Amino acid sequence: LAAFVACGADTPASSVVPAAANVAAPASRPAAPVSTPALQQTEYTQALPSQPLPAMAAIPAAPAPQKQITAPSPQTTARAVRTAAPRPAAPAAPVFPVTVKDGNGDDIVFDSPPERIVAFDSAVVEILFAIGEGDRVVGTHEFVTSPPEANDVPRVGGAFNMDVEATVALEPDLVFLFFDRFKEDLERAGLRVLFIATLSDDFNKVADRIRLWGEIVGNPVSAEAVASDFEERVKTITTTMADYTAGPSVFQDEGALWTPGQGTLIQQVFDVLKLENIAFDVVGYEQISPELIVERDPGVIIASYGDSISGDPVFKDLLAVRNRSVYVPTSDALSIAGPRFVQGIEELARWVYPGLFP
């Protein structure tokens, strides 16, 4: 969980353990889209791990064949769905000055691109490298793991514990913070600071963050290409799922039964993929009880940092465990609100609905 938080993703709320006895059982849920392969299940029949279906679920009508969409691979740049009005072309050359409103509502004016950036945020590091401006990053924090090219960037703290002296020694002309704890100390040391809080309410805003950094560093053309690609891939997913009402129930374990609920980017992902979060009454992140998980019996489990549930006798009768429907992501893409976030959505979509997202 610590790694998840420090990567600049949603920040967990204080630990609250709901009592299972006080929670009403959820209503029965519709099944996943019928265009995915149907499975016949008895109580202890093993289903395909990539396609769990609750046995008691009703099946919605399939959409008209002409609406079927083939989802692209993460590497594809030409997308199957393009229904939005075209965005005006980005300027061919950078335009300065650039004014940015920071997290405190203050205007920060850039008369020229910063050359030496301490990017104390995983998402910003990924954005700068994605738009071809990674050589401007001269410092970051210890939890940055992507892209591999960033491994050689000096570390000046552990996400929430910045070494101000080490930061000053790097002689940056801009320090970016996703929280403002060290802002005054850095400014007293004569450094320019841009504070903007981590995205936590809408992953669609990632594209605008990418464009913002393109303006700041004077590379709007590359930023527009990356941002548009992000938006088109999200559009493909949302359009593919638009004709369906509900899929399987889901529990996401961020470690020690901490789980995301309302007001998180992960809940937004669940909404797009029509997954029914068993932690529907959680706000932010909370640690829930084993009893509540057993009571709500998820059809799918996402084990963000390794599967510690399947081998636990407490959870042996869960539908997801019996069907071997426990998904361990191959990366931390869904933990960081940067360009890779859409890859995390695509990977989860292919695992849950292989018939829709081949």
Q: Where in the sequence are the language-model features?
A:
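Short helix-initiation/N-cap motifs at beta->coil->alpha
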Residues: D102-G105, P154-E165, D180, V282-E291
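Bacterial Sec-exported substrate-binding components of ABC uptake systems
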Residues: A6-A123, I216, V221-F251, D297, ...
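Sec-dependent bacterial lipoprotein signal peptides
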Residues: L1-V5
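Alpha-helical, coiled-coil/dimerization segments enriched in small aliphatic residues
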Residues: F143-S146, T259-E286
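Short helices/loops that flank or line small-molecule/ion binding pockets
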Residues: M162-E171, A189, I288-D297
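Extracytoplasmic substrate-binding proteins
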Residues: D107-V109, L174, F182-W258, A279-D281, ...
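A ligand-binding cleft/hinge motif common to bilobed small-molecule-binding domains
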Residues: R181-R188, E295, V300-L319
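A short, structured surface patch at a secondary-structure boundary
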Residues: E115-L174, F179, L275-I278
